[in-house]
A protein has these predicted regions:
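Short, acidic/polar
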Residues: 27-39, 93-110, 133, 157-161
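N-terminal binding-site loop/beta-alpha segment at the start of enzyme catalytic domains
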Residues: 1-74
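N-terminal small/glycine-rich loop or linker at the start of catalytic domains
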Residues: 7-23, 77-90, 113-118
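Structural preference for beta-strand elements that scaffold enzyme active sites
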Residues: 13-17, 45-46, 73-79, 113-116, ...
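Beta/alpha (TIM)-barrel catalytic core signal, keyed to glycine-rich beta->alpha loops juxtaposed to Asp/Glu
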Residues: 126-180
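Active-site beta-loop-alpha junctions enriched in small/polar residues
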Residues: 21-23, 50-52, 79-83, 119-122, ...
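Active-site groove signature of glycoside hydrolases
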Residues: 106-126
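Active-site mouth loops of central-metabolism enzymes
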Residues: 20-30, 84-99, 120-126
Length: 180
């Protein structure tokens, strides 16, 4: 399988990635294992999931259980921010939620780090700089290699990138690798 550079991250990802939304919802552990084994045999090394996939955590749990010792050979991307409960309290981009959500994802994925951790959708209740600060903290702790975003409209994406650039200029060093 052809590998391509993932932006300026230094990561080399397979030309095809595997979306893991069906794991834990339509596919049980055995079927998930078959899909992942086939994907890895075909040369796929990029696996994309989210904490809400597979009925709130099921996809990450099955992916973590299946990868095992192959974790070092793959690029794991997961998202946070969509509601993990019926009331919608376990959601968003607040610092408090981001820090707790990553711990839950790390546990389900059975890994010490996430290669790409990204906000699933905009959180109108949280300033983007708060979310970026939390992601920066996770990068400094080694829990997240790169931060990104998903489903942000162009103007919000531009604002997020400007906030990240401004903070980086102020700190005189780059601590978080933001790819959104």
């Amino acid at each position: 399988m052809i590998r391509r550079a993932f932006g300026k991250t230094g990561l080399m990802v397979s030309a095809l990635g595997l979306g893991c939304n069906n794991f834990g919802r339509r596919l049980d552990l055995e079927k998930t294992r078959n899909v992942i084994d086939s994907a890895i045999e075909a040369g796929i090394n990029f696996f994309d999931t989210a904490d809400v996939y597979g009925d709130r955590g099921g996809s990450e749990t099955l992916l973590g259980a299946t990868l095992g010792t192959r974790r070092n050979d793959v690029i794991l991307a997961t998202k946070f921010g969509l509601p993990m409960d019926d009331e919608g309290r376990l959601a968003g981009g607040s610092r408090r939620y981001v820090l707790s959500a990553v711990e839950a994802s790390l546990k389900r994925l059975k890994t010490e780090w996430i290669d790409i951790y990204y906000l699933h959708r905009p959180d109108p209740a949280t300033p983007i700089d708060e979310t970026l600060d939390a992601l920066d903290e996770l990068a400094r702790q080694g829990k997240v290699r790169f931060a990104g975003c998903s489903n942000l409209p162009g103007p919000q994406l531009a604002d997020a990138m400007e906030v990240a650039r401004t903070k980086r200029r102020r700190s005189q060093r780059r601590r978080t690798n933001t790819i959104c």
